A protein has these predicted regions:
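N-terminal edge beta-strand
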Residues: 20-36
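Short solvent-exposed capping/turn motifs at the termini of beta-strands
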Residues: 49-52
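Membrane-proximal low-complexity regions enriched in glycine and acidic/polar residues
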Residues: 81-184
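Short, aromatic-rich amphipathic segments at membrane interfaces
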Residues: 178, 201-230
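Extended, hydrophilic extramembrane loops/domains of integral membrane proteins
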Residues: 182-212
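Juxtamembrane interface at the cytosolic side of transmembrane helices
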Residues: 228-231, 238-252
Length: 252
């Protein structure tokens, strides 16, 4: 009797999962190499929606894709002008701000899900959970968070493209998201969400690796493994280049 009580809920969960659609996502580049000439990349996120028994819903579903970079701890400083001089005034520290965030959706997010669902899945730069560690006042928190979002949007590190996901025949989807030239190396995630009637019914993730290559990779490895020799070499090069520039200037 006890075994049947354990098996029955598991069967119910399996049957309910079988009734939900599934996502089969992919991305055009699983690895992005950063070289000295890197000016950014344009990633294609695409895939298919698999419905149980091939039955498509009467009402078309929506797709939201989110590309996230490694999380960072960041400190924001607010400057104020005192006696004609700009000085640091207030500051705020965020423990887990994504280094990069890009989102595309088949329609504006407000038309797809409610505020609560958008906050749970972080669908939009205004829904990011940045984990502030040094602020208690909500007004200050909102001001600093808005400043961080604005700064990263101007640097191309926070991107929103509502209404740009293309869905064909209610089955195939595709979206393009830009990867800024300012991105850091690390592991990125490409998340895809399938939304029906305001509810996320399926989600899938693909990993993207951003790494340095060529001379940039050699310099990064050298700085990490042989930091002392790397520092001496950098100083020697700086002194040598300064001496050479002075010698050329004297001849001219």
């Amino acid at each position: 009797m006890r075994i049947s009580r354990l098996i029955l809920p598991a069967l119910v969960l399996l049957l309910s999962a079988a009734d939900e659609p599934q996502l089969v996502p992919d991305v055009s580049q699983r690895e992005v190499e950063i070289q000295y000439s890197f000016t950014g990349a344009d990633l294609l996120l695409f895939g298919a929606i698999v419905y149980p028994d091939g039955r498509r819903p009467d009402k078309p579903a929506d797709i939201v894709v989110v590309l996230k970079g490694p999380e960072q701890s960041i400190t924001m400083r607010e400057k104020q002008k005192v006696a004609g001089i700009w000085v640091n005034a207030d500051r705020a520290r965020f423990r887990s701000a994504p280094s990069f965030y890009a989102m595309a959706s088949s329609r504006p997010i407000a038309q797809i899900v409610d505020e609560r669902t958008a906050a749970i899945y972080e669908l939009g730069v205004d829904k990011l959970q940045l984990s502030p560690s040094s602020l208690n006042d909500s007004a200050e928190l909102d001001r600093f968070q808005a400043g961080l979002v604005d700064l990263r949007q101007r640097n191309g590190l926070f991107v929103e493209r509502p209404g740009t996901v293309e869905i064909s025949d209610d089955v195939l989807y595709r979206a393009r998201l830009p990867l800024s030239a300012r991105v850091i190396v690390g592991d990125y995630t490409a998340e895809t969400f399938l939304v029906q009637d305001g509810r996320v019914v399926a989600a899938a993730v693909r990993d993207i690796h951003v790494r340095k290559s060529g001379f940039e990779q050699f310099m990064a490895v050298a700085a990490e493994r042989w930091s002392f020799l790397y520092g001496l070499t950098a100083i020697a090069l700086a002194v040598g280049m300064g001496w050479a520039a002075g010698a050329v200037a004297r001849r001219i």
